[in-house]
C-alpha cells in the first residue's frame, strides 16, 4: 500500500514504543562512560510510554494526523527525560510539523510524499532546536535518513518498503557512530541514543509483519467540503484568545463597487498565521469555498482579512479564555521571594535538605530516573513562587530543565538554573542561597561557590576504558571530578585516599570532609573508612548514609 491511515499509523507508533520498552536495558548498557548509570534506554522508554499513555487517554479527540501530531509532540516534550528524551521529542516535533501546519481537520491518511516531507522536516527542526548538535548521535541518524529523501535515494512505492529503506539507513548509521565520535570507538560501543531511535523505527515497521492489509480511510474533496462548523472541540491549556471559524464564499460581494481579491491559499495562510495560531485553512476550489479555523486575540482582524476575498456563509467565534477559566481553579497567589526546585538521587539527601533548608520541591531520581519537563513544572507548583531556581545535580538534566524554563517564561514566572556535578555540590550551593536576594544574585553566588568547591564521586568501572592517560579496567574503583576520571585503583581504600589527595590540591585551607556512602557500603565499613581518613589527613569528617545506588562514596572538602 502507498498510504497508511490514522488508526494504523497510531498502531505503528505503539509498536515503536513497545520496541523501545523491549530493548531499553540493552540500550542502557551502551553507555560510554564506565560509571554504570547508563540511562538512555530508560529515558527513552519513560518518555515514549508516558506520552503514548496520554495519547491513548485522548484518543477520542484524535480525528486527524494534525490532532495526533499536536497531542503526541506536546506530551513527548512534557514527559521527555534526559538528553535522549528531549532530542527525540524535537525529532518527532519536526516529523509532525508539516502535518500540524498544513493538514486539515479531516486528513486521516498519509502517503509516500507525506512521509518524505515528514522525515526531512524532522531533521530541520531537530537541528534547529538543539543548540549544539553532535554528530554520531540520533541526530545523525535522522539527518542521513532525510538526505536519502532529498537525494531521492529512497524511491519506495509502498509505505512498508519506505520504512525498510529508512531502517536500513538507520542501522548503517548506528554502526558508523563510533567513527564519528572517538569516545564511542574507544569504548567499543555504538551511540545509545542512535541505537534507541533505530529501535523505535524498527518497531514501527513491525506493523507490516502483523497485518497484511491497510484500511483506506481518506476523505474525498467532496466530503471535505461538506464539513460543518459545529462539532466537539478539545481545549488545551495553551488555547487562549478566540477560536474563530468561518466558511467564506470566494469572490462574492454584496456591493458591486467592491471587487474582491484573487484567492491564493499559500499567501492567505501566511497572512492568517501572522495574526493567529492553530491555523487550519481548507479550500474547495470546485465550489469556491474556503473554511478557516484559527486562534487569535483579535478575531476582528481575522474577519477583516476574510472579507478581502469574499463573503461569509457562516461564522462562529468562541472565547477560549472563558472556557479555560471554567476548567481551571483560581490562580494561586505566588510569593515573589525566590524558591528552589532541587534534584537529588535519594530520599536520604532529600531528608537532609528538608531538615536544613526547609525546601519541599525535591525530585529524587534514583528510582524515577531523570526528571521530565512535566515533573519539573509540577515541582514548581509546590513552591508557590514566581521566581524559581532549578538546582540540578546532573548535567544530563539540562535539556529538560531548559525546556521547563521556556514554558515558565510563558507563564510569566522568572526562572534560572544552577548545574552541579553531584548532590554534595548541590548541598554546598544551598549554603549560600538567600531568599531575600533576587534570582540573578543568588544564581551568580551559587555558581561561583560551586566552582570553588572540591568534590568527587567514587564507583566501580563497568568496562575497560581510557581517559586522560588513566587506564581503567573493569571492576576498578574510579573517582570522577568535574565530569572527568581523576583516579583509578584496584582497592577502594587507596582510591579514596588518592581522590582526597586530588581534591586537596583545589582547597587552600582544608578543614572539613563530608561523605555520603552508598548502598554497597555498610555503616561499619563507612565508620572504618572515616577513622582512616581522620588519622591520615587530620580532617574533621562527617559520614552519612546517602543510599545512592551507583556511587560507593560521594566526597566533598571545604
Curated annotation (Swiss-Prot):
GO molecular function: glycerone kinase activity
Pfam families recorded: Dak2 (PF02734), FakA-like_C (PF13684), FakA-like_M (PF21645)
Single GO BP term: glycerol metabolic process
Source species, domain of life: Bacteria
Alphabetized InterPro entries for the sequence: DegV_domain_contain, DhaL_dom, DhaL_dom_sf, FakA-like_C, FakA-like_M, YloV-like
Occurrences of domain DhaL (ranges): 7-206
NCBIfam families for this protein: YloV
Protein name: Uncharacterized protein MG369 homolog
Species the sequence originates in: Mycoplasma pneumoniae (strain ATCC 29342 / M129 / Subtype 1)
Amino acid at each position: 500500500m502507498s498510504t497508511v491511515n490514522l488508526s494504523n499509523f497510531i498502531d505503528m507508533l505503539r509498536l515503536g514504543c513497545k520496541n523501545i520498552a523491549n530493548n531499553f536495558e540493552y540500550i542502557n548498557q551502551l553507555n560510554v562512560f564506565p560509571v554504570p548509570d547508563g540511562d538512555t534506554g530508560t529515558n527513552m522508554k519513560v518518555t515514549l510510554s508516558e506520552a503514548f499513555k496520554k495519547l491513548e487517554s485522548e484518543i477520542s479527540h484524535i480525528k486527524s494526523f494534525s490532532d495526533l501530531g499536536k497531542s503526541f509532540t506536546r506530551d513527548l516534550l512534557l514527559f521527555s527525560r534526559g538528553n535522549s528524551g528531549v532530542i527525540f521529542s524535537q525529532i518527532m516535533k519536526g516529523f509532525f510539523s508539516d502535518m500540524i501546519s498544513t493538514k486539515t481537520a479531516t486528513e486521516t491518511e498519509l502517503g509516500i510524499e507525506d512521509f518524505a516531507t515528514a522525515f526531512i522536516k524532522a531533521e530541520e527542526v531537530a537541528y534547529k532546536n538543539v543548540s549544539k548538535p553532535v554528530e554520531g548521535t540520533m541526530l545523525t541518524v535522522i539527518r542521513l535518513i532525510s538526505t536519502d529523501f532529498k537525494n531521492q535515494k529512497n524511491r519506495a512505492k509502498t509505505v512498508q518498503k519506505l520504512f525498510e529503506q529508512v531502517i536500513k539507513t538507520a542501522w548503517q548509521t548506528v554502526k558508523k557512530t563510533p567513527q564519528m565520535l572517538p569516545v564511542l570507538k574507544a569504548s567499543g560501543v555504538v551511540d545509545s541514543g542512535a541505537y534507541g531511535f533505530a529501535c523505535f523505527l524498527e518497531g514501527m515497521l513491525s506493523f507490516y509483519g502483523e497485518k497484511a492489509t491497510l484500511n483506506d480511510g481518506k476523505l474525498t474533496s467532496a466530503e471535505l467540503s461538506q464539513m460543518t462548523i459545529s462539532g466537539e472541540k478539545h481545549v488545551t491549556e495553551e488555547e487562549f484568545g478566540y477560536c474563530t471559524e468561518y466558511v467564506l464564499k470566494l469572490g462574492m460581494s454584496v456591493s458591486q463597487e467592491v471587487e474582491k481579491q484573487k484567492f491564493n491559499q499559500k499567501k492567505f495562510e501566511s497572512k492568517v498565521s501572522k495574526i493567529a495560531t492553530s491555523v487550519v485553512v481548507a479550500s474547495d476550489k470546485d465550489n469556491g469555498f474556503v473554511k478557516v479555523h484559527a486562534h487569535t486575540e483579535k478575531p476582528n482582524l481575522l474577519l477583516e482579512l476574510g472579507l478581502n476575498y469574499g463573503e461569509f456563509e457562516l461564522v462562529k467565534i468562541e472565547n477560549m479564555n472563558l472556557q479555560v477559566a471554567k476548567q481551571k481553579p483560581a490562580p494561586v497567589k505566588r510569593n515573589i521571594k525566590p524558591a528552589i526546585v532541587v534534584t537529588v538521587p535519594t530520599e536520604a539527601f532529600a531528608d537532609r535538605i528538608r531538615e536544613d533548608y526547609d525546601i519541599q520541591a525535591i525530585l529524587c531520581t534514583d528510582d524515577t530516573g531523570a526528571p521530565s519537563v512535566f515533573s519539573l513544572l509540577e515541582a514548581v507548583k509546590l513552591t508557590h513562587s514566581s521566581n524559581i531556581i532549578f538546582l540540578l545535580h546532573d548535567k544530563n538534566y539540562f535539556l529538560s530543565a531548559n525546556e521547563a524554563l521556556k514554558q515558565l517564561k510563558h507563564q510569566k514566572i522568572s526562572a534560572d538554573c544552577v548545574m552541579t556535578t553531584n548532590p554534595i555540590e548541590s548541598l554546598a550551593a544551598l549554603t549560600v542561597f538567600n531568599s531575600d536576594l533576587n534570582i540573578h544574585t543568588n544564581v551568580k553566588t551559587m555558581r561561583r561557590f560551586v566552582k570553588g568547591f572540591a568534590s568527587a564521586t567514587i564507583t566501580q568501572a563497568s568496562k575497560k576504558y581510557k581517559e586522560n592517560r588513566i587506564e581503567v579496567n573493569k571492576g576498578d574503583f574510579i573517582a570522577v571530578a568535574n565530569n572527568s576520571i581523576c583516579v583509578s585503583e584496584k582497592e577502594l581504600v587507596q582510591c579514596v585516599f588518592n581522590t582526597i589527595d586530588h581534591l586537596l590540591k583545589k582547597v587552600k585551607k582544608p578543614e572539613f570532609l563530608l561523605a555520603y556512602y552508598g548502598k554497597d557500603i555498610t555503616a561499619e565499613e563507612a565508620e572504618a573508612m572515616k577513622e582512616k581518613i581522620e588519622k591520615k589527613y587530620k580532617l574533621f569528617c562527617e559520614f552519612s548514609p546517602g543510599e545512592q545506588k551507583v556511587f560507593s562514596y560521594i566526597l566533598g572538602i571545604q
